[in-house]
Amino acid sequence: MTSTQEQGPDIVSAPLRDAATVVLVRDAADGIEVFLQRRVKQMAFAGGMTVFPGGGVDKRDADADLAWTGPEATWWAGQFGSDAEIAQALVCAAVRETFEECGVLLATDADGAFADPEGLAEDRQRLVEKSLSFAQFLTARGLTLRADLLRPLAHWITPVNEKRRYDTRFFLAAMPDGQHADAETTEAEVARWVNARVAIDSWAAGQHFLMPPTWSQLNYVSQFSTIDELLDAERVIEPILPNVTPGAGLAGLGFPGSDEYFRTLGDQQPPEITL
């Protein structure tokens, strides 16, 4: 594990929940753009923060009864240090959450064509309401999950002092041709495509707020000129569990790159500002 966790005597760790986050990217004239959302302030976790689409694993995401193209669950398990069942659930959660939160569906029909998300609005809402499982949705629509369109990116674990804790695997995915990322989710106030470096610079200027995991992924993406270079890059995924200095708040977190993060952050605190 990249960071060793320090616990104070009064810290009682909340249970971890598996989660998946997708860094959706596209090429643009000025470099790689990422799809970002600003979560509504009322959200119990990361309210008001700028984030990527993603969320917790639904236990039904582990349902193996679905069509799947790309690396098998055992390969993903090796990348993320989990068992195959959890790995499959993480991949399914990544694709499901991306569809639920921004309408982008990484699944194709029998002819290899991407489904039209606009014609699946009712299914999308049922997935959000959890009245339909992702496997049921794909099977009913004759769709195949495209695990080959995803790449493993990172693995962050919420510090032990947080009330809600997630064991989050980050995925990369290129925006499919012919699809449109929208803001039709109750979890976000604003959603838009932003150049990765611009997103960091605007955070440094106090225009929005990035949590360390989000900042870290943007910082990584900004080092590449094209999506092909980014997707083809070799990565070794190591879990990152930030150190905690009890009573020190955000400034008490230690993680890879934390010196740069806090130097750029300066005196900012999570603000009520715009993306």
What kind of region is each of these model predictions?
Residues M1-L275:
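N-terminal leader/linker segments that precede catalytic domains of diphosphate-processing enzymes
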